[in-house]
Amino acid sequence: MASSINGRKPSEIFKAQALLYKHIYAFIDSMSLKWAVEMNIPNIIQNHGKPISLSNLVSILQVPSSKIGNVRRLMRYLAHNGFFEIITKEEESYALTVASELLVRGSDLCLAPMVECVLDPTLSGSYHELKKWIYEEDLTLFGVTLGSGFWDFLDKNPEYNTSFNDAMASDSKLINLALRDCDFVFDGLESIVDVGGGTGTTAKIICETFPKLKCIVFDRPQVVENLSGSNNLTYVGGDMFTSIPNADAVLLKYILHNWTDKDCLRILKKCKEAVTNDGKRGKVTIIDMVIDEKKDENQVTQIKLLMDVNMACLNGKERNEEEWKKLFIEAGFQHYKISPLTGFLSLIEIYP
């Protein structure tokens, strides 16, 4: 008699095995993508001007002849995952897809820095210590593996800090693409402060689109100290937990998900002070995820839940609408409005 688990049919068991193997080896998804970026393959295909044959690709890569078959295997797998298209005519060739177009260095929208930053062993390697982290009372995952909090680690490691800032800037460019169609966010404003605005990628887009709007990029002093502004763009260094420059509006893009509810309340209260000084009643605009497992498509939910686990390792979290609402009320805001922004991000406007 065939063995079974709890009376399961063999077909169910084998389906479960396939699911397990898919996730056991899922690291190859990330590492093969990292390989393509490190080998500059998207740019090679882009510069070729047409689908590139395997023989031309390995010639440009200058790989040993013994590894040509391995290059083909990796390209076949990446194509299966949607990063390249295989064209079969006289010789197997590879073309870019929308996904790999986002990895072409030098293009307006390039996420290659994000691939390099997140998949650097410094960051990705920390996830081998999830078990140890779970039993530590107060430490974040990176506190366990790096010996300090993530932000302290960035301050002490300029090279990785640059990589992180480049990654955040590359991601901001995609968000900015969506913001161009959100004129209503900036209507009637004379000033806005981008809290945690990094090197100013988002603020520059806002300034170009709304030249009469005064933009302030507010970030840690070491991030902005060597940056120069323009007519309607200025950089200010400081601590968002202490005070935030006054403005008609505050922008928090990918900020609150980094922090605990307690810390978010501190930030939101400082934001409220910044937009209500001098009798004004401005607003706070948040760009972040809103988890909705009932309404979202499965793939969107998976991304949001994946990011929630990722943020948990920083002591942050992704939130559903009820969790957001609770924060806003406790911080003293009266009402809010949520609008879809991109495939998995929302634009939240809150008013004191």
From Swiss-Prot:
Pathway: Phytoalexin biosynthesis; medicarpin biosynthesis
Pfam entry (one): Dimerisation
Keywords (A to Z) from UniProt: Methyltransferase, S-adenosyl-L-methionine, Transferase
Catalyses which reaction(s): a 7-hydroxyisoflavone + S-adenosyl-L-methionine = a 7-methoxyisoflavone + S-adenosyl-L-homocysteine + H(+)
InterPro entries recorded: COMT-like (IPR016461), O_MeTrfase_dom (IPR001077), Plant_O-MeTrfase_dimerisation (IPR012967), SAM-dependent_MTases_sf (IPR029063), WH-like_DNA-bd_sf (IPR036388), WH_DNA-bd_sf (IPR036390)
Biological processes, Gene Ontology terms: methylation
Keyword Endoplasmic reticulum tagged: no
Gene3D superfamilies: Vaccinia Virus protein VP39, Winged helix-like DNA-binding domain superfamily/Winged helix DNA-binding domain
Domain of life, per lineage: Eukaryota
Enzyme class per UniProt: transferase
Presence of the UniProt keyword S-adenosyl-L-methionine in the record: yes
Binding-site list for substrate: V118, L119, D120, P121, T122, L123, S124, G125, S126, Y127
Entry GO MF terms: isoflavone 7-O-methyltransferase activity; protein dimerization activity
Catalytic residues, chain numbering: H257 (proton acceptor)
The EC number(s) this enzyme carries: 2.1.1.150
Function: Transfers a methyl group to 7-hydroxyls of the isoflavones daidzein, genistein and 6,7,4'-trihydroxyisoflavone. Can also methylate (+)6a-hydroxymaackiain with lower efficiency.
Stated family: Belongs to the class I-like SAM-binding methyltransferase superfamily. Cation-independent O-methyltransferase family. COMT subfamily.
Subunit structure: Homodimer.
The protein, known as: Isoflavone-7-O-methyltransferase 6
Organism from which the protein derives: Medicago sativa (Alfalfa)
